[in-house]
Amino acid sequence: MSDFPSWHIVGDWFDNCSCAVPCPCTFAQAPDNGFCESVLFWHVREGYYGDVKLDNLSFVRVGRWEGDLWARQATVVAGLYIDDHADDRQMEALPMIIGGRAGGFPGWVNECFAGGRKSRGIERAQITYEIAPDLGHWGVDIIGKVKAWAKAIGGPTSPPGKYPQLINAPGSETGPGPQVVTWGKSTILSVDAHGFKFEYTLNSAKHIPFDWVGP
């Protein structure tokens, strides 16, 4: 990894996918029905890639994988959208990180796709997102392409304003460490982007912070 500069990004991640609640992937299990169709979202609050600042940038991955990711038996096809206010250097840096080429936790995840990875491209897009301060809801829109929103799960025995969370997740999608998973359920998941077209409601969603360094 000596050909890559040092980098560090910190922020929020959430997903909205085809699996039932709770998502088995977070427990290091194979996805429901052997596949996962999903929207993955990242917002970088602070970050850099060498001398390229990455503060306040968002990106969205739409795709499908088949097989058990954590058993390193998965195959994935995906496309990426990056904030339309990213400049050319930022557009080059973010795919290096998320694609795993620049190491860190994404590099480790890249090795889990032993069946292969296929990219359907990278595009700029106007990305609108919201994450409630209390993590009661979260979501992202890319007009005409992606709509993925969720609410944190509550129930008859939940204290008001308190949502189910998990620590020490065996399959945390943002890696090992002190990350806290907040469980949610989708209110809408609609994708017509990068050749994917799918819709789900009342399926799995979750929010997890991330703090990644590399290479």
Question: Locations of the language-model features?
Answer:
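Short amphipathic beta-strand and strand-loop transition segments with alternating hydrophobic
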Residues: 25, 62-65, 125-132
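Charged linear interaction tracts used for macromolecular binding and regulation
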Residues: 76-166, 172
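N-terminal ordered "arm"
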Residues: 2-49
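Extended, charged low-complexity segments
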Residues: 153-215
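Aromatic- and glycine-enriched beta-alpha-beta binding-site module
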Residues: 34-107
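Low-complexity, flexible helical/coil segments
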Residues: 51-58, 115-120, 176-180
